[in-house]
Swiss-Prot record:
This is Probable nicotinate-nucleotide adenylyltransferase. Pathway: Cofactor biosynthesis; NAD(+) biosynthesis; deamido-NAD(+) from nicotinate D-ribonucleotide: step 1/1. Its EC number is 2.7.7.18. Catalyzes the reversible adenylation of nicotinate mononucleotide (NaMN) to nicotinic acid adenine dinucleotide (NaAD). It catalyses: nicotinate beta-D-ribonucleotide + ATP + H(+) = deamido-NAD(+) + diphosphate. Gene3D superfamilies: HUPs (3.40.50.620). HAMAP family: NaMN_adenylyltr. InterPro entries: Cyt_trans-like, NadD/NMNAT, Rossmann-like_a/b/a_fold. It comes from Synechococcus sp. (strain JA-3-3Ab) (Cyanobacteria bacterium Yellowstone A-Prime). It is an enzyme of class 2 (transferase). Belongs to the NadD family. NCBIfam families: cyt_tran_rel (TIGR00125), nicotinate (nicotinamide) nucleotide adenylyltransferase (TIGR00482), PRK00071.1-3 (NF000840). The lineage of its organism: Bacteria, Bacillati, Cyanobacteriota, Cyanophyceae, Synechococcales.
């Protein structure tokens, strides 16, 4: 990555469906915040993700509310409803352009899991998107070697990226939804406020 401009704020964007948000997301955001000296991590729940179908069980409003609950006690985490409000597919490049227009004196870092990074060359306007920001790649134990995936993507796109040094968890939103559907426990897998919201609103009970 190029040297940071000391005059610019450094904001990381963590996008995802957060269906539901869990401690793996929080660990990723916290480690990115400190390892890359970010001023803030902006959480960006997807409205209608174009690259994968959105699993049922929670509305856009529910997913947004759960993220807000999960990060409520962190002074350097913030949540945006930009993609939730915007009609149509939630294209990352449109989100990034909007943020850059609103805050032109900011250096942007997109936090992405290695599983999503593998598909980045197929994303909408991928080449321009790769150029617009820095990329922080979070490893996953079930998604292959992060360095190898990054080399493969860098051969196709002009990407400036670094790999996050963080625990490689297998925890996923899919697993949590399955646990809830079969009446299992999600205690310690999500923040208590998120678990309470899920139980109170009876989310993810139907397969």
């Amino acid at each position: 990555m190029s040297p940071p401009d000391p005059q610019q704020r450094r904001i990381g964007i963590l996008g995802g469906t957060f269906n539901p948000v869990h401690h793996g997301h929080l660990i990723m955001a916290e480690q990115a915040l400190w390892q890359f000296n970010l001023d803030q991590v902006l959480w960006m729940p997807a409205g209608d993700p174009p690259h994968k179908p959105l699993a049922a069980g929670a509305s856009k409003a529910d997913r947004l509310a759960m993220v807000k609950l999960a990060i409520a006690d962190h002074e350097r985490f913030a949540c945006s409803d930009l993609e939730i409000r915007r009609p149509g597919p939630s294209y990352t490049i449109e989100t990034l352009r909007s943020l850059m227009q609103e805050q032109p004196d900011t250096q942007w870092y997109w936090i992405i899991g290695v599983d999503a990074l593998r598909d980045l060359p197929q994303w909408y306007q991928a080449e321009e998107l790769a150029r617009l920001c820095h990329w922080i790649v979070a490893p996953r134990i079930d998604a292959g070697d992060a360095a190898q995936v990054l080399r493969s993507v860098a051969a196709k796109l002009p990407i400036r990226a670094a790999i996050l040094d963080a625990p490689t968890l297998t925890l996923s939103s899919t697993y949590l939804r399955q646990q809830i559907q079969k009446g299992g426990s999600i205690r310690y897998l999500v923040p208590p406020a998120v678990e309470h919201y899920i139980r109170q609103h009876r989310l993810y009970l139907d397969p």
